[in-house]
């Protein structure tokens, strides 16, 4: 997954601009929807795969998790995460690891994956990623995923601050670009994976109780932002998936 390493090292250099654009959908839809599924993390061990610069990782630790480990294949993103940890120490360990080839990190109570699975270039790669997440959970542990919605609408993308350029009638694994509306635009290449495929991959990896739902606006969205949040929620750009290791 070298291409993902290269492009996210490039994104790391313009991260502040990207963060400013995507913060609306993250704060008003993605994080609230994701947080609701995490449950009580007090005293829990959490592995956050594909942690990027650690935005969600730090929030997870602040929810009371006893141990949090963040991994990402991009050295640039991990450098940003470690810088944030140095500025405000929370006891989070960050490691450069590719989920598709990551060695066993331990048995965690919860594994989280935020916008990771759409970087799988083949179904086999995604299957390996799913097996790795499964292997790093203790029996009864939970997987909580935030992933791209393959059926997102142009209206929701525009409101969220980016645009996807999928091929017409995309097939599983087809590559396409996402252009974040920074100046100049920041382009990221990802792959098309229908939700049904992701669910099937998780079942094949050994997960049970696999369930998914579209992200939705938080009840605490400011009145002035509700119209934009409603547009973001029309076939939104993201969805959540939960699963359990028996």
Question: Residue spans of the language-model regions?
Answer:
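Conserved class I S-adenosyl-L-methionine
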Residues: 1-41, 55, 59
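Mobile, glycine- and charge-enriched loop segments
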Residues: 35-47, 139, 143
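Class I SAM-dependent methyltransferase SAM/SAH-binding core
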Residues: 47-49, 53-101
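A short SAM/SAH-binding and catalytic strip from SAM-dependent methyltransferases
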Residues: 110-124
């Amino acid at each position: 997954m070298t291409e993902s390493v290269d492009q996210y090292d490039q994104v790391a250099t313009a991260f502040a601009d990207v963060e400013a654009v995507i913060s609306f959908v993250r704060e008003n839809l993605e994080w609230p929807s994701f947080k609701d599924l995490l449950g009580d993390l007090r005293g829990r061990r959490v592995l956050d795969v594909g942690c990027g610069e650690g935005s969600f990782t730090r929030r997870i630790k602040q929810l009371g998790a006893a141990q949090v480990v963040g991994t990402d294949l991009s050295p640039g993103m991990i450098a940003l995460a470690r810088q944030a940890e140095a500025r405000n120490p929370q006891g989070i360990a960050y490691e450069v690891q590719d989920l598709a080839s990551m060695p066993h990190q331990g048995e965690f109570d919860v594994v989280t994956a935020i916008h990771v699975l759409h970087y799988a270039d083949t179904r086999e790669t995604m299957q390996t990623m799913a097996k790795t997440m499964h292997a790093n959970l203790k029996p009864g542990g939970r997987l909580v995923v935030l992933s791209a919605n393959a059926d997102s609408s142009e209206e929701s993308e525009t409101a969220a601050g980016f645009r996807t350029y999928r091929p017409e009638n995309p097939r599983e694994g087809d590559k396409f670009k996402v252009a974040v509306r920074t100046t100049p635009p920041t382009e990221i290449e990802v792959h098309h994976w229908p939700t049904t495929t992701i669910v099937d991959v998780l079942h094949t990896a050994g997960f049970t109780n696999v369930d998914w739902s579209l992200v939705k606006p938080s009840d605490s969205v400011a009145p002035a932002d509700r119209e934009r949040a409603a547009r973001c929620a029309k076939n939104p750009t993201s969805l959540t998936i939960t699963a359990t290791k028996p």
